[in-house]
Structure formats: structure tokens, C-alpha cells
């Protein structure tokens, strides 16, 4: 997907066309727009939810390349495994997120704590706070402002979110 976006951008395809086309392509847990289900109950109609299991530098760069085509403010809910180099991973998103809310991946021993992720995000000058779970994280972000809420950092994390949805 990321390579396809890169090629489209290199071919000077308008970002508006890319933005309209990508939601029609489906890879579970990869740039997955949530249009129905329990998650939608937590947000307003003018808020979009994207799930992406990006957890490596390469997948982070690919996600960044897509997110930078979005014109709305983007907020992040971030859960990640300790062995995936979270500090390096987050560097891929400079200037993208208006705010990051960190969460621990449920039932994962190797998950970073909310405090560990908050410290990483704060050191990279992000507005950040913690939440006990992704539902509380959504509550800390949702408002009347149109926006995109991007869940990212781990396929385990995205899987747990999808299970709840």
C-alpha cells in the first residue's frame, strides 16, 4: 500500500484522488477506516477513525506518507511493543499529529506502558497524555472539531481494537 501511495505521488497524481481512492482498498488493520461498529458510538459523525498496525520504520513511513495527504487535523491513539523501537518509530510522524494519547496494549506482556510512550512522545515535542484504554483515549480526543483519529503502533493493538468493534 505504501509503495502504491509513493508511486502515485511520484506520478503527480493529485492527493485528493489518492485520498478518495485509498478508503476503497481493504487490508484488515492497514489504513482501515472504521465506518460502522461499536467504535463509531464513541465519536461524532464529523470524526473519521483510521486503524493501522504500523509498527516498523518502513510501515511508519508509509503511514506518514498517507496521513500527510489528509487535510483534517489528525490525532493519534498509540500503543506499541517494547521491542519495536518506539522512539525511532515515532520520529516518522513529525508534524502530523495534533495530539497523541498513549495506551497499553491489552494482555500483551511486551507492551510499552502508557508512561513510557508518553515520555517518548513528550521528548519529541508532541502534546500527549495517557489513557487506561482506547475507549478513554477516544473520549480525550473527541470534540465537535472535524478530525481524523488514527490508531497505530502494533498489529496486536489494532487486533484488540477490531475485536471490540
Predicted regions and their residues:
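Nucleotide phosphate-binding/pyrophosphate-handling subdomain across enzymes
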Residues: 1-99
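C-terminal helical cap/extension that packs against the catalytic core
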Residues: 9, 44-51, 90-148
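Short amphipathic alpha-helical segments
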Residues: 62-64, 89-91, 113-115, 162-165
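Short Gly/Pro-enriched loop/turn and capping motifs at secondary-structure junctions
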Residues: 82-84, 106-109, 157
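H/E-rich (His + Asp/Glu) clusters that bind or coordinate divalent metals
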Residues: 122, 158, 164
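Short, active-site-adjacent cap segments at secondary-structure transitions
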Residues: 137, 157-159
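Active-site-proximal loop/hinge segments that shape catalytic or ion-binding/gating pockets
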Residues: 154
Amino acid at each position: 500500500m505504501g509503495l502504491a501511495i509513493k508511486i502515485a505521488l511520484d506520478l503527480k497524481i493529485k492527493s485528493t484522488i489518492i485520498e478518495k481512492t485509498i478508503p476503497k482498498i481493504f487490508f484488515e488493520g492497514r489504513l482501515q477506516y472504521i465506518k460502522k461498529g461499536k467504535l463509531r458510538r464513541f465519536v461524532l459523525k464529523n470524526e473519521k477513525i483510521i486503524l493501522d498496525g504500523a509498527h516498523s520504520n518502513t510501515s511508519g513511513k508509509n503511514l506518514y506518507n498517507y496521513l500527510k495527504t489528509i487535510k483534517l487535523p489528525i490525532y493519534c491513539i498509540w500503543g506499541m511493543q517494547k521491542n519495536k523501537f518506539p522512539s525511532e518509530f515515532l520520529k516518522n510522524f513529525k508534524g502530523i499529529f495534533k495530539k497523541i494519547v498513549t495506551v497499553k496494549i491489552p494482555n500483551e506482556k511486551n507492551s510499552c506502558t502508557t508512561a513510557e510512550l508518553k515520555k517518548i512522545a513528550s521528548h519529541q515535542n508532541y502534546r500527549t497524555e495517557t489513557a487506561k484504554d482506547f475507549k478513554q483515549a477516544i473520549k480525550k480526543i473527541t470534540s465537535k472539531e472535524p478530525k481524523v483519529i488514527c490508531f497505530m503502533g502494533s498489529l496486536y493493538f489494532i487486533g484488540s481494537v477490531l475485536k471490540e468493534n
